[in-house]
């Protein structure tokens, strides 16, 4: 039994579902999971939630946050130095990539898990929820979540075998996400890539709207347009999956009870092991 600890700081699309990607039917017998979170806050003092996770004594620690280069997420992961740690974050965390390597941390950086348009004049709880729903659809339908899932499962498999795991060093680009999506139809693949690229660009617009522009007449339309872009990305990602449904070629990779990844394309066919 591998004990997986998940520490979440702040909000990101991947953080919403990461533990469920490992046990979608709640019937795996090879892992047990505990999750602690600091909620929306990411200040260094919030990293004290790591102490609660230490009591679980995890075999593998996953630290999920936006911009893992910030002091708060840094303090959280360093609390587990000496254990296998995987950092899951977004494109701005690339600034800390060399540090991750030096400290022996694995990383999965999801380019399309873009920051939200956090201007008070625009962002309310409803808008926040809708944006994250769109992000989740993009990451799920393009294949990005599968890439995250398989990278973590590889580490779990090594730990089950008593081996020292090789921690992932993955930047989830559009090409890598869509490869994991394993699309059969080239138009579905193209739509998935378009969705991912649009979602990536959302971060650039929101950075400008949240941190650069100071005039409300300029920054409000910017963050609103970024959210419209993510909505369009989610629509295109959904269309990609619908094309695959039409040809009965949706790629599925459920877990067996012993944690093995199964695979299938046709809806009615039996699974085979990867």
Regions found by a protein language model. Name each.
Residues 1-58, 64-274:
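Anaerobic metallocofactor- and corrinoid-dependent redox/one-carbon enzyme cores
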């Amino acid at each position: 039994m591998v004990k997986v600890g998940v520490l979440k700081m702040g909000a990101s699309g991947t953080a919403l579902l990461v533990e469920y990607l490992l046990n979608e039917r709640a019937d795996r017998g090879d892992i047990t999971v505990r999750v602690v979170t600091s909620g929306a806050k990411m200040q260094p003092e919030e990293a004290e939630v790591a102490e609660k996770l230490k009591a679980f004594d995890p075999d593998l620690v996953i630290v999920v946050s936006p911009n893992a280069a910030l002091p708060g997420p840094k303090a959280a992961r360093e609390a587990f130095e000496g254990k296998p740690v995987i950092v899951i974050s977004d494109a701005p965390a690339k600034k800390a990539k060399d540090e991750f390597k030096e400290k022996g941390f694995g990383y999965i950086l999801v380019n399309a898990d873009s920051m939200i348009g956090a201007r008070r004049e625009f962002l309310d709880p409803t808008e926040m929820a809708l944006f994250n729903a769109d992000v989740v659809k993009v990451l799920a339908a393009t294949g990005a979540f599968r890439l995250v899932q398989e990278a973590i499962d590889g580490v779990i498999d090594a730990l089950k075998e008593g081996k020292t795991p090789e921690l992932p060093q993955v930047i989830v680009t559009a090409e890598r996400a869509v490869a994991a999506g394993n699309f059969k139809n080239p138009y579905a693949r193209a739509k998935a890539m378009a969705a991912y690229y649009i979602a990536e660009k959302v971060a650039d617009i929101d950075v400008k709207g949240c941190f650069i522009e100071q005039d409300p007449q300029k920054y409000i339309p910017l963050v609103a347009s970024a959210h419209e872009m993510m909505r369009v990305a989610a629509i295109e990602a959904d269309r990609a999956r619908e094309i695959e449904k039409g040809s009965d070629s949706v790629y599925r990779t459920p877990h067996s009870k012993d944690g093995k990844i199964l695979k299938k394309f046709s809806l009615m066919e039996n699974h085979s092991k990867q």
